[in-house]
Amino acid sequence: MDFGALPPEINSARMYAGAGAGPMMAAGAAWNGLAAELGTTAASYESVITRLTTESWMGPASMAMVAAAQPYLAWLTYTAEAAAHAGSQAMASAAAYEAAYAMTVPPEVVAANRALLAALVATNVLGINTPAIMATEALYAEMWAQDALAMYGYAAASGAAGMLQPLSPPSQTTNPGGLAAQSAAVGSAAATAAVNQVSVADLISSLPNAVSGLASPVTSVLDSTGLSGIIADIDALLATPFVANIINSAVNTAAWYVNAAIPTAIFLANALNSGAPVAIAEGAIEAAEGAASAAAAGLADSVTPAGLGASLGEATLVGRLSVPAAWSTAAPATTAGATALEGSGWTVAAEEAGPVTGMMPGMASAAKGTGAYAGPRYGFKPTVMPKQVVV
């Protein structure tokens, strides 16, 4: 199309007839917004993949995932740049339109020039309007040239603004057969689960039969070995009255002997258990006798024989008891230091130094007269005889 061949009425009408630069500016803003969103998505995508493969997930699988994701990341980056370029080109087209619109002669001015020319031609008597007609034609020619120049410039600017980067859909980053394989795996798992359920149901239903069939091998063994007939004969023999009476008598007799032996066994056990205390008591008595003999020897050595005397054939009486003559003088010496316990009628002899470390517990002191008692008496009581001196 040659805009110079078109009159200004057409060029001006076309320039003023459109919607203006508004739609192109809106398109440029939309492209810029899309470019910003794609750029943000690409940056987030790259950040997530980098953090995932360098911190949490490392290995051949992560490297394979990175290799599969790289084409999509490259597409996001390229598409964001292409969208931004398209937005800028749209803005450039809008600016070119604004410039062409400003250079174009308004259609009203062109129409007024044509109306003036028609009036001058109609009233041109004797050529008096010829100069005015020539000026009007010259002005119209300028309008023609101006509109043509505006359209040529607008066409050039629009052609440059229309150079956009080609866009393409993203490449496939996953295996196209993955969904089909997943569906097949799910179907196989469902079929396997159904088969397993059927198998479990069959097992549960067959358990009673299997348990009840455990007795069949025993029966078959008895039948194959001929033991079933022998067992039947034995049962018949045991069922006869004579054999049954003999067996019952033997069982009853054995039971009677067992019942009679139980008390005897209990008695023997008790007797065996009581032997230990008796042995302990006998050992204690022997130890007491040995200690008493040692104490008597020490006491005899510690008694001084001075002042003692005896008459041959005579004995000293203690009550109705005949005792050696030495007891009448030796006994007071052993009880001279006796002290009475407060609040009781018992007396305890004071200890005396001597070769004997201690007296045997249970030795009674000499009598102090009617109503006097020695210390507590318990256990074995030895009788100590002092050494007699014959004068």
Swiss-Prot record:
Stretch list, region Eukaryotic-like SH3 domain: 312-367
Inducers of expression: Up-regulated in tuberculosis dormancy.
Localisation per UniProt entry: Secreted; Host mitochondrion
One Gene Ontology cellular component: extracellular region
Pfam families: PPE, PPE-SVP
InterPro entries: PPE_C, PPE_dom, PPE_sf
Keyword Secreted: yes
Domain of life: Bacteria
Effect the entry attributes to changing residue 14 to A: Reduces the interaction with PE8. Lack of interaction with PE8
Paired cysteines (S-S): none
Domain notes: Contains nine predicted mitochondria targeting signal sequences (MTS), majorly spanning the C-terminal region of the protein. The C-terminal region (amino acids 312-367) is disordered, hydrophobic, contains a eukaryotic-like SH3 (SH3e) domain and shows similarity with the C-terminal region of mitochondria-targeting eukaryotic pro-apoptotic Bcl2-family and BH3-only proteins. This C-terminal region is required for secretion. This region interacts with host TLR4 and NOX components.
Role summary: May play a critical role in the homeostasis of triacylglycerol-containing lipid droplets in M.tuberculosis and influence the entry of the pathogen into a dormant state. Is recognized by host TLR4 receptor at the macrophage cell surface, which modulates the host immune response, induces mitochondrial stress and perturbations, and induces macrophage apoptosis leading to pathogen persistence. Also downregulates NOX-mediated reactive oxygen species (ROS) generation in THP1 macrophages, which increases intracellular survival of bacteria.
Protein name: PPE family protein PPE15
